[in-house]
Curated annotation (Swiss-Prot):
Name under which the protein is recorded: Endolysin
GO molecular function: N-acetylmuramoyl-L-alanine amidase activity
Gene behind this protein: PLY511
Record key words, sorted: Antimicrobial, Bacteriolytic enzyme, Hydrolase, Repeat, Secreted
Subcellular localization(s) per the UniProt record: Secreted
EC number per UniProt: 3.5.1.28
Region annotation Disordered: where it falls in the sequence: 175-201, 248-267
GO biological-process terms attached to the record: defense response to bacterium; peptidoglycan catabolic process; symbiont-mediated cytolysis of host cell
UniProt signal peptide: none
Domain N-acetylmuramoyl-L-alanine amidase, residue spans: 23-153
Cell wall biogenesis/degradation listed as a keyword: no
Native source species: Listeria phage A511
Pfam families: Amidase_2
Superkingdom assignment: Viruses
Length: 341
C-alpha cells in the first residue's frame, strides 16, 4: 500500500450540491505540461466558478484536496458530475522519477476514494450513470456525453501505460497486502511498440489513432471529420464511431478537388488574456447568464483565438471550442474581444 498525505486546501465558497448517487470516482489529467501542482491548485482556486475537481496528484506523489467529496463537483460534464463522489486530476511531468511516484499515488488515491464510497474497483465498465466504478474522463465523453475530453489515457500512454495496465494496477492496489508495494513502473518512459499488441478492432477512436501513431488531438479529429463529411463535429460518441469507421476505410476521396480556404472571408475573434473569462452558451438558447454552460479562459493560454462559425448579430458569435463544442459567446468591442480577418 502506498502512503501519502492529503494537503487540505479546500476552496472557500464552493457550492455543496447534493449528488444523485455516489457512483463514480473520475480519473482526469491536467493536459498542461508546463504547469505544477501548486499552479494548478492556485488557478482552480481563482477560477472554480468555471470548473473544479476534488483532488490533485503531482509533484512527486503529493495529494492536494481542494473540494470536499460526496458533493457535486464540476469537472466531468453535466451528466457525470452529479454522480461523482470524487474527481482526481493527475498533473503532468517530464521527469520519470516524479511520474512514477505520482502514478503510484494516483492509483492508490483512486482506489481509496472508491472504497470509501462503496464503489467497485472497476475501470470504465458499463455505459450508464447507474454503472458504478472508477471512470476515466474519456469514458464519460464516450458513454454519457456532456464533455469531449479524452483524458487520462494519452498522457499515461506517453509513459508506456496502456488502459489495460492502468486497470490492472488499480486492481493490484485494491488487493492491499497482495501487492506488497505499489505497481512497479519503469524509471524511464517505455518506448511505444512499433506494432500495437492490442486488438485494434476493440479500440475506440482516440486509442486507435494513438496505436496508429496518428495525431488524436481534438483539432485534428475535427479536421478529419470535415474531410470525411461529418458535419458539426463536437466529439460525441456517435460522431467518434462514425469517424473511426471512415478512418479504417481509408483516405477520403472527394469527387471534386477541395477548394482552398478563403482567408479573406474567414473572420476570427480574439479574446485577450487580460480581460477575464468569457461565458459561453448553447446555440439553441438565449445567451444570458442563466443559460451559461461554462467559460473560456484566455488568461490561462495567453489569449485565445477562434474562427467565427456564425455571426448572430449584436456582438454574439458562434465558435467551436474543444471543451464545450459549438457555442455562443458575447464578443462585442466593449468586452475587449477583437474581430480579425
Amino acid at each position: 500500500m502506498v502512503k501519502y498525505t492529503v494537503e487540505n486546501k479546500i476552496i472557500a465558497g464552493l457550492p455543496k450540491g447534493k449528488l444523485k448517487g455516489a457512483n463514480f470516482v473520475i480519473a482526469h489529467e491536467t493536459a498542461n505540461s508546463k504547469s505544477t501542482i501548486d499552479n494548478e491548485v492556485s488557478y482552480m482556486t481563482r477560477n472554480w466558478k468555471n470548473a473544479f475537481v476534488t483532488h490533485f496528484v503531482g509533484g512527486g506523489g503529493r495529494v492536494v484536496q481542494v473540494a470536499n467529496v460526496n458533493y457535486v463537483s464540476w469537472g466531468a460534464g453535466q451528466y457525470a458530475n452529479s454522480y461523482s463522489y470524487a474527481q482526481v486530476e493527475l498533473c503532468r511531468t517530464s521527469n520519470a522519477t516524479t511520474f512514477k511516484k505520482d502514478y503510484e499515488v494516483y492509483c492508490q488515491l483512486l482506489v481509496d476514494l472508491a472504497k470509501k464510497a462503496g464503489i467497485p474497483i472497476t475501470l470504465d465498465s458499463g455505459s450508464k450513470t447507474s454503472d458504478k466504478g472508477i471512470k476515466s474522463h474519456k469514458w464519460v465523453a464516450d458513454k454519457l456525453g456532456g464533455t469531449t475530453h479524452q483524458d487520462p489515457y494519452a498522457y499515461l500512454s506517453s509513459w508506456g501505460i496502456s488502459k489495460a495496465q492502468f486497470a490492472s494496477d488499480l486492481a493490484k492496489v485494491s488487493g492491499g497486502g497482495n501487492t506488497g508495494t505499489a505497481p512497479a513502473k519503469p524509471s524511464t518512459p517505455a518506448p511505444k511498440p512499433s506494432t500495437p499488441s492490442t486488438n485494434l478492432d476493440k479500440l475506440g477512436l482516440v486509442d486507435y489513432m494513438n496505436a496508429k501513431k496518428m495525431d488524436s488531438s481534438y483539432s485534428n479529429r475535427d479536421k478529419l471529420a470535415k474531410q470525411y463529411g461529418i458535419a458539426n463535429y463536437s466529439g460525441t460518441a456517435s460522431q467518434n464511431t462514425t469517424l473511426l469507421s471512415k478512418i479504417k476505410g481509408g483516405a477520403p476521396k472527394p469527387s471534386t478537388p477541395a477548394p482552398k480556404p478563403s482567408t479573406s472571408t474567414a473572420k476570427k475573434i480574439y479574446f485577450p488574456p487580460n480581460k477575464g473569462n468569457w461565458s459561453v452558451y448553447p446555440t439553441n438558447k438565449a445567451p444570458v447568464k442563466a443559460n451559461a454552460i461554462g467559460a473560456i479562459n484566455p488568461t490561462k493560454f495567453g489569449g485565445l483565438t477562434y474562427t467565427i462559425q456564425k455571426d448572430r448579430g449584436n456582438g454574439v458569435y458562434e465558435i467551436q471550442t474543444d471543451q464545450f463544442g459549438r457555442v455562443q459567446v458575447y464578443g462585442a468591442p466593449s468586452t475587449g474581444a477583437v474581430i480579425k480577418k
